[in-house]
């Protein structure tokens, strides 16, 4: 039931003093209301119960296993939230002078230092407010680099066919023409096609490594050589950095610039539309183009580095210093784990993914790349089951909800038909993985015996299967409900 439908006239949430009546003549006539505001009227208890009930109907990391591939839905330690909310940080005004913000600036400076070491880059800017914005900034830096050299003919950006959708979008927003490079049957970049494609118009290539196919790009050194010899640069999409923390650094692979998704790799909160953070790191060729502000250190302490100190910067991407609360959470996460802890993140995320992959293969599910070891995630294709029983990846995703699991990513990457992209993360126990395997085994039996059970799933949720075509074509969106075929507000 909607909160508007629970409304009853003259119910109030809080008792408060009645404000002094203002003479209506003091207010311009065009600003006066003619009708009561269309807001629900409920008691405080009714409001609390309503939103608490809604929260229990959500799937979240705090309540369910959430193997959403390419999203790294790991547990966010509560200690980071608690420490980042200390009054000294929480109540600091963005315009506070640097001498009064030394502790805050020290945290950001040390975060910069740790992230440059983790990535193998020269410098980093923390100001981007999301991974997509950081990605845009990195591509803009590549453009600024070529233009600073008078190389205006480099108008093409190479993007793999398995890339995240933000990759071609960022390239297009920066004015580049996107050139798609295909992937081989083993999940690697097609080097022969890359050699043919790279040339005088190539500005760079955008890669995720490990890729969204769940495998490591084994020929990355050769890819870097081909692009650099053609005069281009390498952009690293940090979406899958979790798999290689402390093991292999993007800078050592030959990448020139990258962004990091703090909400994935460094356990800051997901969802809700933000706040987020997508720091941008760069090697020697591009570090002078990083967005400002950054934090510097001198003999007097810590201070902001702005356009004055960084004249080649592409400029500002956000007001003040981006989402500093998110940055503090990532800083605390890194301090809690330390260098050895970060290496264990990569080890356990890879171990969990490979365990899950092998167990599902043993049950009879088809792996997209059966001859490859998984990185931190893997793909199964349901095409054989679709052909035999008419059950789709969407059907399995819906049925998993009935077993108490959030569905994996479905239909991505696009080049693998009827696929599930599964990422268990390092924070899940073997017992949780085994429960998921049991659910998948039961679903596999249902596919072969009662496929209609899946086609109509979910069966145990508040909202069952929707008519997705109708929902997309016949939108019915409003901020308040109305009675059918009338404009009468539900009261």
Swiss-Prot record:
Sites of N6-(pyridoxal phosphate)lysine modification: 264
GO biological process: glycine decarboxylation via glycine cleavage system
Reaction(s) this enzyme catalyzes, per UniProt: N(6)-[(R)-lipoyl]-L-lysyl-[glycine-cleavage complex H protein] + glycine + H(+) = N(6)-[(R)-S(8)-aminomethyldihydrolipoyl]-L-lysyl-[glycine-cleavage complex H protein] + CO2
Superkingdom, natural source: Bacteria
GO cellular component: cytosol; glycine cleavage complex
Cofactor(s) required, per the database record: pyridoxal 5'-phosphate
The EC number(s) this enzyme carries: 1.4.4.2
Record's keyword annotation contains Oxidoreductase: yes
GO molecular function: glycine binding; glycine dehydrogenase (decarboxylating) activity; pyridoxal phosphate binding
Enzyme class, UniProt record, top EC level: oxidoreductase
Disulfide-linked positions: none
Coiled coil regions in record: none
Keyword vocabulary terms for this entry: Oxidoreductase, Pyridoxal phosphate
Presence of keyword Oxidoreductase: yes
CDD domains: GDC-P
Subunit field text: The glycine cleavage system is composed of four proteins: P, T, L and H. In this organism, the P 'protein' is a heterodimer of two subunits.
Function (record text): The glycine cleavage system catalyzes the degradation of glycine. The P protein binds the alpha-amino group of glycine through its pyridoxal phosphate cofactor; CO(2) is released and the remaining methylamine moiety is then transferred to the lipoamide cofactor of the H protein.
Similarity annotation: Belongs to the GcvP family. C-terminal subunit subfamily.
Protein name: Probable glycine dehydrogenase (decarboxylating) subunit 2
Lineage of the organism: Bacteria, Pseudomonadati, Pseudomonadota, Gammaproteobacteria, Legionellales
Gene: gcvPB
